[in-house]
Design a protein with these regions (language model features):
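Intrinsically disordered, metal-sensing/regulatory segments
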Residues: 2-259
Length: 259
């Protein structure tokens, strides 16, 4: 009889563990799909410019760009760097961080030389995919930090989608609907990267930290190379408040989830 009880107990524990893993699997898909869907949502807002041009004065557009920069900075300061420095020594921290910046620099040079419509799509993926990988791996260790990172990625992807769609449609023959469709397909990469981070990388804490710092270094380069210069508008002082708002929302999210 005791052996039967032990067998039943082990079976229940295994079943509970399987259910927990399945629930985490579904949550990660949701957490990575929402930030991905934010890209086509932001792109669809760019299409409203043709309907109501007065809504999209230059000050509003620059404020939206600045908001995305603030959200990106929040991701670096509140999630990626704190998670990244946990498991690495100072030398590796510096190497991973600067490697991310160097990789984004090389990508920026390559995209500038090519100057193709796909450049904007590649630029968006270059920070979205590493962040989704880090999200999945982080969720395995701290669910609160994973939720926070998902929210911050969504905040940054809305203005990124908006800005990228505007640039693509203005320089090519592609319509807003076509760009929105492309961004929607890109959103599916989020769950793939997130699940990879959760099931493959979560057991390698040093590698997760390295990826987080790599993404942080690249994003910081991106902020000051591309986003901050676009946010500045001569004789207008309100757009930088968008960056403050983006960062503040990241801070409030951190407070709310207790990460």
């Amino acid at each position: 009889m005791p052996s039967n009880i032990c067998s039943v107990s082990r079976a229940l524990c295994l079943r509970k563990g399987a259910v927990s893993t399945l629930n985490d699997w579904m949550i990660i898909i949701f957490l990575t799909l929402i930030p991905g869907i934010a890209m086509p949502i932001g792109a669809s807002f760019a299409g409203l410019e043709r309907i109501r041009p007065r809504w999209f004065e230059s000050e509003v557009r620059h404020s939206v760009i600045a908001f995305g920069g603030g959200a990106l900075l929040a991701a670096v300061a509140l999630v990626l760097v704190p998670e990244g420095v946990k498991n690495l020594d100072p030398l590796l921290i510096a190497v991973c961080f600067m490697s991310g910046a160097a990789a984004f620099l090389l990508l920026d040079v390559l995209l500038a030389a090519k100057a193709t419509p796909a450049s904007q799509l590649v630029a968006m993926l270059s920070d979205f995919v590493p962040e989704a990988l880090a999200l999945g791996a982080t969720f395995a260790v701290s669910k609160a930090s994973g939720v926070l990172l998902a929210g911050i990625i969504a905040l940054q992807n809305l203005p990124e989608g908006f800005n990228a769609c505007g640039e693509v449609t203005s320089s090519t023959h592609y319509r807003v609907s076509q760009v929105v469709g492309a961004f929607t397909l890109m959103a599916l990469l989020g769950p793939i990267a997130g699940l990879t981070g959760y099931f493959v990388l979560s057991d390698f804490s040093e590698l997760v930290s390295a990826i987080s710092l790599f993404a942080a270094g690249g994003i910081l380069y991106l902020i000051f190379q591309d986003i901050a210069p676009q946010a500045k508008l001569e004789k207008h002082w309100a757009p930088p408040l968008g960056a403050v708002a983006g960062f503040l929302l990241g801070v409030m999210g951190k407070v709310a989830v207790g990460a």
